[in-house]
Amino acid sequence: MIAETPAPAADALRSFAPSKAEGLPRRDAIALTLIMLTHGVGQTLIFAILPAVARDLGIADQAVSLIYVLPAIAWSFMTTWWGRHSDRRGRRIVILTGIVGFMLSQLMFAGAALLGYAGWIGAGTLWALILLSRLVYSGLSSGSLPASQAYIVSRVSPAERATALGRLTASWNLGNLLGPAVIGLLTALGVLTPLFATAALALVIWAWVRGCLRSEGPGAGATPAGRLSPLDARLRSSMLIALCGSFAQASLLQTLGFYLMDHLGVATAEVPRAVGFALMFSAISTLLAQTVFVQSLRPMPRTLEILGAGINAVAFLGLILADRLFVIWIATALCGFGYGLLRLGNVAGASHAVRGDEQGAVAGLNSAMWSAGYIIAPLAAMSLHQIDPRLPYIAAMLGTALALTAAKGRKEALEQA
């Protein structure tokens, strides 16, 4: 499937290079891009490899769901802590710690699975070790994104902020796109080979980034302004938009396969292929939104939020009314495009609303809110699906409509940094 997407990927890669007008050195931009790319690939590997390992070694499906949910909860708490920590200690040390966390978690997962395949540990112990590996990732690596965002914000003008942050988030999405290709190439050597390979890649990137990011960044050694609250008057609308957007996206990802079977009657054997194409189209659309669209038009954050929420609401309406698989694919592509605009506008808008000494804290808080939907959706969306397969998407549509209302109801934040 990845071989069919060279043009969007090429367009995205060309747009990663910062313009001369930006204050972010090209060396730093490349380093941050590689970090996010690696995280994106690693995320795809876990979603692809964990089900196979669990089925092979007897871990129950319900137990697997906890491996997703518990680290997501840990991520939402730790990302805010790391964001504040980067305001005090600097961005560089937090970014480097995130790479170490990624490497350790991949090795711990692979090592536990090897012990399981060798018959040295049972399913219960294996589950605990895999869960621990994911908690290590959440605990140490959840600071990578907010610290990287704050690193960029401190070096670019407000006018260039959305485009610079767009390249950062798009590189994670590009990693999600490239992940299946990595899996296809390396699993021929063993199901765990991609985990060892990405851990080795992380070590190389850590050594290179350690030499590239020479500055800790503004805030190193300083006293942070204090804990930010999602109820802060400057941030209430942004945090509400993030929560609604996160819930909508998580509901789509976690119920789509069931929706295809229960609403369209797609055969079980065809579901992985159908969902795979849907997610591929969504990822490509997100990548195009955050690179080609944003880099070309350079809209303001509030405009991005309004466009993204509006497109998402229309896309979920399409999912609700869909009676053909190709309509589902079109709707999920629209969801990806809207999600890309909405999240980017939300991240940039929140950064505009606070002072320079609060950039790490707001980036961490924003990341936590975008993670919260993945905690709520497994229970809420699946419960709604049991009543009617369309209900999760009706709830998601209402959520994006609420996000649209919140975006339209507030003024563009003025730069306070």
PLM regions: where:
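Juxtamembrane intracellular "pre-TM" segments in multi-pass secondary transporters
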Residues: P8-R26, L213-I241
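Helix-loop boundary and gating motifs at the non-cytosolic
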Residues: E22-A72, S237-I241, G245-G265, V271
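C-terminal ends and interior cores of transmembrane alpha-helices
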Residues: V100-A123, I311-D323
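Cytoplasmic helix-loop-helix junction between adjacent transmembrane helices
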Residues: S133-W172
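C-terminal transmembrane helical hairpin of 12-TM major facilitator-type secondary transporters
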Residues: P301-N346
